A protein has these predicted regions:
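Short low-complexity stretches enriched in small and charged residues
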Residues: 2, 21-25, 67-68, 157-166
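Short amphipathic alpha-helical patches
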Residues: 19-20, 82-83, 125-126, 145-153, ...
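A structural preference for short, pocket-lining loop segments at secondary-structure junctions
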Residues: 1-15, 196-203
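Non-catalytic terminal/interface segments that mediate subunit docking, oligomerization
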Residues: 162-203
Length: 203
């Protein structure tokens, strides 16, 4: 079964974690379980809804898909700690908001406007997953021809390799039903990354 995390954690006073977490391992047990689930191939989907400071930021980063609201931020050291240590005033969102983690670091995959949209996006993510890992690559849809004819590729890709062209137009003529789910479009814009199907198989 997939695991969903709804994350909104402002951290805690470390000497008191023995009274906050069960067992003698503290928060480390949570991160260990994150790693073990990942090793077993269990999908982990995280929604970041607010402040995620220190340990609160580890869990989303370990997850397979991470959604951040515009109000959320993930940091190891918050603005107050930076101000105390380096006498620098920096806004928390400037350190670890969606502009940083979706647009630069890649620690989050998608940004959404608010909590309602975040939960809806996580529901859609869940709905796209199969009931078990075995049928994953053929789950849900049969093979389908592209909506745009592959014969049009000759008019899209120029003979001169120095001439730029729109790669998404090429993808639309190769994948099933011309459906392509682009991932991390704000990072490394010279490369297009995403998920689609070819002959019914996820690629």
């Amino acid at each position: 079964l997939p695991v969903l995390y709804l994350v909104d954690c402002s951290g805690l006073f470390l000497p008191e974690q023995s009274t906050t977490f069960r067992g003698h391992r503290g928060a480390g047990h949570i991160f260990k379980m994150n790693s073990l689930l990942s090793d077993e191939g269990v999908p982990q989907i995280a929604g970041v809804f607010g402040d995620c400071i220190a340990g609160g930021g580890y869990m989303p980063i370990i997850s397979d898909k991470v959604y951040m609201t515009e109000q959320a931020y993930m940091v190891i050291a918050g603005a107050a700690l930076i101000k105390g240590a380096k006498s620098q005033k920096m806004p928390s969102h400037g350190i670890g908001g969606p502009d940083v983690h979706v647009g630069i670091s890649g620690c989050a995959d998608f940004r959404v406007p608010d909590d309602t949209h975040c939960i809806a996006a996580m529901r859609r993510e869940m709905a796209s997953l199969p009931s078990s890992a075995v049928p994953y690559y053929r789950y849900g849809l049969d093979a389908a021809p592209p909506r745009f004819s592959p014969s049009e590729l000759a008019g899209i890709v120029p003979a001169d390799h120095r001439v730029a062209y729109e790669a998404r137009e090429v993808i639309a003529r190769l994948v099933d039903d011309s459906l392509f789910w682009e991932v991390l479009p704000e990072i490394g814009k010279e490369v297009i990354t995403g998920v689609a199907r070819i002959s019914g198989l996820y690629v």
